[in-house]
Amino acid sequence: EITYEYNDEKEKDKVISQSIKVGDIINKGDTLKVVISLGKLDKEKLASDNINELGTVPIMMYHGIVDMKSSETEYTGGNVDKDGYNRTAEAFREDLEFYYQNGYRMVRLTDYIDGNIDVEYGKSPIVLTFDDGNENNLKVKGLDEDGNIIIDENSAVGILESFKEKYPDYNVTATFFVNGGLFNQPEYNEKILKWLVENGYDVGNHTENHLDIKKSTSEQVNKEIVSVYKQLDEIIPEKYVNIIALPFGSPYNKEHENFGYVLKSTYNGATYETKAALRVGWDAEYSPFDKDFDPTFLKRCRAYDNNGKDFDIEMVFKLLETKRYISDGNVSTIVTSEKNSSKISDNVNKEVITY
């Protein structure tokens, strides 16, 4: 078990202390705990580098990734439909390159929600999500001689995996929200789900039939949510995430009578609790350390092109330039300016450093 902390006496990356020393008798079950130095705390550098772990975090919302060049579509930029919900493979590759070159590093949605943001110094977290379980999210071309799935290199996961190879320091991950058809490849669905959770990706709930929760009965809401959780329980028990991406972003406020069934769903004797719910748009979300952070109703940023208007991908990242979360590289501390300190949640159990 390794933790890091600032230390005025030990140089960066040197061992400050360890629980088991030379000559110690090691018993079964003993854990080696090591504390590594981050070097001397330099508040002037933190300030000059704009380190701010109270900044906002973009949760990107994707749907289909279509094997096309952007020049082949009649719509704006990399959009494949007029509303920009589906994106060309070329545009998705460009998105990933843009994130990397502009200092964004992917983190798991669950880690963001839990405040476990492990991002290198000076970089910013970004979360990727995909709705609907489209076949082109992870398209299977067949099986190899060992029975493993062969992933289409132009599907979303194929493209993501290529970035793992291109940038070894790029923590490639995403959360896929599925309906009752899972990834719409019946002969491969089970293998797809298992492959995803074994390779750094997560799978969540998008209701059985893409239900408009605002327009539905309480029984429908419970049935649709429980149905997907039960499917995931049967195939990847304890390995999926209890998170729902709300179809259509509905209901549009937490006061709606059906919202309680989103967070706790019961049908035919089965009950599931949901830790977080995702909306459809539009802007970056609060830091998980901000007192206004609410994981049960998280905003997302639509990954579409609209010439820098209406919170398209260009506009979102332009706005983030002055308010983005910038990491100090230490998951055990929260660093921000003194003027931001009043925004820190009372529930935070990490060391707070201000400059």
Language-model features: locations:
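Ligand-recognition elements built from short beta-strands and adjacent flexible loops
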Residues: E1-D42
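Solvent-exposed coil/turn segments that connect beta secondary-structure elements
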Residues: E5-N7, S37-G39, I65, D131-G133, ...
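Envelope-exposed proteins and targeting segments
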Residues: E11, I16, K28-L32, T56-P58, ...
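C-terminal active-site subregion of NodB/CE4 polysaccharide deacetylases
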Residues: L46-L128, K139, K215-Y355
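Short loop/turn segments at strand-loop or loop-helix junctions that form parts
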Residues: M60-I65, T129-G133, N179, H206-E208
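Alpha-helical scaffold elements lining the catalytic groove of polysaccharide deacetylases
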Residues: K141, N148-I159, F183-D202, E208-I236, ...
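Alpha-helix termini
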Residues: N148-I151, E161-N171, I235-P237, V262-Y272
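Acidic (Asp/Glu)-rich catalytic clusters
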Residues: L160-N171, Q185-N205, G269-T271, S287-F297, ...
